[in-house]
Amino acid sequence: MLTVAGIRYRNIMASQGGPIARVDTAECQVFGRRMFQANVRLNAAVQEPRQRFVIFGNVDGTGTHPVPTVARHMAISEAIERWAFRSVSKSVDRVLYGFDTDRSSSGMAAYPGLFDYQCRQRAYLEAIERYSLIAWWEGQARGRVRDTEWPGVSALEIETPFRQGRAVVVYKRCEPGFFAYGHAAAGSFHSACEKAIVELARNEYVLRRFWLAGGVQERPVDLFERRCLFFSTAEGHELFRERVAQAVTAPAGRPPVVFDGEIPGPWTTYAQVWRVVLQPVTDAFLTNTERYFFW
């Protein structure tokens, strides 16, 4: 897909008046494939106060790709999305962009492209992923387990009412005895798995360090991190398996679109930010419980 990131991100660093304070890039392995991971921090003027205890790190954007420049551009785009979310989700304009319906960042994307559809397509797939995950967990979408080409990794393919998106959850038992997951949506089953595998690999790396260190008594501040930790345990994975085995008698139909449009702001200088909000089957995914498979 056509991108002009090299042009739009040329003055992105704080030293040039931009919103990005720091970009770090390192080589990594994703199931034996050489890739690069970039982590980005926003500058102090546009970031929230850092949380006191986190296990996934206090970065604002992450990107993983075989090409280091692309990984950096992906991480910058994610940080810009985060900037827009933090600025708008609690503002007086929040209702205009569907944050009264879904106060999470679901259905958001940032992309330094030339045309609206480039960013919208990413936001739409993000919305499909999150909607499908919630509907499946609530017993309103069927799922079937499929093998994958990655050793030890299974995939749950979630049936969706959308023509343009396939949603999956990939999962794996990891040493020394925890479970890691990744979920994504894309145009095909294989493409969705490829995206989700990167998320699984990141989670596996962080969770292995956490559990090999013996865990900690202090609870993470972030609800989604607490959920990720819970479902990495044997108890959490058993709850996940119970949901995989549940019968679905009345699948949810195609949901109403609450919002589908651009979120303008100072970030538009660098990238377009788009959001698609699909009416979720419930708002229970935002309740303060660790026993909900959504993060």
Protein language model regions, located:
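Helix-coil modules at protein/domain termini and other flexible surface or pore-lining loops
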Residues: M1-W295
